[in-house]
């Protein structure tokens, strides 16, 4: 569900995917995520979607008076009946160097690294790390750990290995030495909350930390908040 309407619900306890609600006064269209931002992107109906593909969800009232991009990225696990999982937000993507990393890949990489090192993450943000002094560009992972790994190098290596396994664009750039591996900056407890307080007049359940950014504004703000602690 969302403020725009009620879209899906879980109908089986052993399946985390949600059944798309097709009889609720909402017309759905799905834009392949790689076409988002194009002048004339493909807009598919439920008849034409494919399982496993990332789509940006668009909804239109049955009267056609309004149409809206919800901001969620979804993937179908099956069709007829149509079941979906939420793969992240449309803003959760970094493609500064041709690596095209999505939010669900970042979340899965974090889980893999936590499983490998015994760490637990309470908050995170990923941003580009610009090239300096001839170094290769890469990504900075700003992480507030609930339980930190014994060695950040092992955590970084696990992140890198997972991303190379699941993302061929990332793998090609890493293999070609065009992209450096992940760099983790461990932030002190409360750094993310302090940043939220500094950048929002009011904090509520709807106040969220952006998980990924194509720029450095959030990352630099978080580092500044950490330095003030």
Regions found by a protein language model. Give the residues of each.
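Active-site glycine/GP-rich loop and adjacent strand/helix microenvironment
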Residues: 1-229
């Amino acid at each position: 569900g969302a403020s725009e309407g009620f879209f899906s619900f879980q109908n089986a306890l052993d399946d985390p995917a949600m059944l798309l609600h097709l009889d609720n006064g909402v017309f759905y269209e799905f834009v392949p995520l790689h076409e988002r931002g194009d002048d004339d992107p493909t807009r598919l109906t439920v008849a034409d979607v494919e399982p496993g593909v990332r789509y940006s969800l668009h909804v239109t009232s049955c009267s056609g008076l309004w149409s809206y991009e919800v901001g969620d990225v979804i993937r179908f696990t099956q069709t007829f009946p149509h079941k979906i999982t939420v793969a992240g937000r449309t803003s959760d993507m970094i493609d500064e160097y041709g690596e095209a990393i999505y939010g669900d890949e970042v979340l899965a990489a974090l889980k893999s690294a936590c499983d490998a090192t015994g760490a637990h993450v309470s908050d995170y943000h990923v941003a580009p790390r610009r090239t300096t002094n001839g170094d290769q560009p890469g990504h900075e992972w700003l992480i507030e750990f609930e339980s930190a790994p014994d060695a950040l190098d092992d955590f970084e290596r696990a992140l890198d290995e997972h991303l190379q396994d699941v993302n061929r664009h990332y793998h090609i750039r890493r293999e070609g030495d065009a992209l450096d591996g992940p760099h983790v900056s461990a932030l002190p407890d409360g750094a993310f909350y302090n940043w939220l307080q500094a950048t929002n007049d009011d904090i509520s359940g709807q106040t969220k930390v952006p998980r990924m950014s194509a720029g450095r504004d959030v990352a630099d703000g978080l580092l500044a908040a950490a330095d003030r602690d």
